[in-house]
Design a protein with these regions (language model features):
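Long alpha-helical rod scaffolds of large eukaryotic non-enzymatic complex subunits
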Residues: 1-144
């Protein structure tokens, strides 16, 4: 059962990372293609010159940026929960592979202006520290 859990945790983290990476990148890229930031026509409203296209684009980017922030926070929450569960169950995750997948996701997000790699560093530092502490405590109990 435990071996199955280890494989399942690794497969879940890897697959959810890949799904988020592909879908978020595609959606943001397509959204920006549909609503490009092009300054074209300006009009005069009262005594103030306003660029309606620019105002609309600012609104559109607020929408996509809010959605992007929501999705990234959701992904980071899922990642933290699964890493915490692997500590709780004393799982042996192939950490280098998990980190590679997650940082590749971060690299993809940096291409659309949402670099999450600094948050990933904090998450994995916390995970490694907790995992190390658990292993030290376990060894102390075993040999004390």
């Amino acid at each position: 059962y435990l071996f199955y859990f280890h494989l399942l945790a690794f497969a879940y983290i890897s697959s959810i990372t890949e799904v988020f990476r592909i879908n978020i990148f595609d959606i943001v890229t397509q959204y920006r293609a549909i609503f490009p930031d092009i300054d074209t026509e300006s009009i005069v409203v009262g005594s103030e010159k306003r660029n309606l296209r620019k105002v609309a684009n600012e609104c559109n980017y607020k929408i996509i940026n809010s959605w992007l922030l929501f999705k990234i926070e959701h992904y980071l929450k899922i990642l933290r929960e699964n890493l915490d569960a692997s500590i709780k169950h004393n799982s042996i995750l192939p950490l280098d592979t998990v980190i590679d997948h997650c940082f590749y996701f971060g690299l993809s997000m940096s291409k659309i202006g949402a670099d999450i790699r600094p948050q990933l560093i904090c998450i994995f530092n916390r995970f490694i520290q907790q995992r190390f502490q658990l292993r030290v405590d376990s060894a102390n109990k075993k040999y004390a």
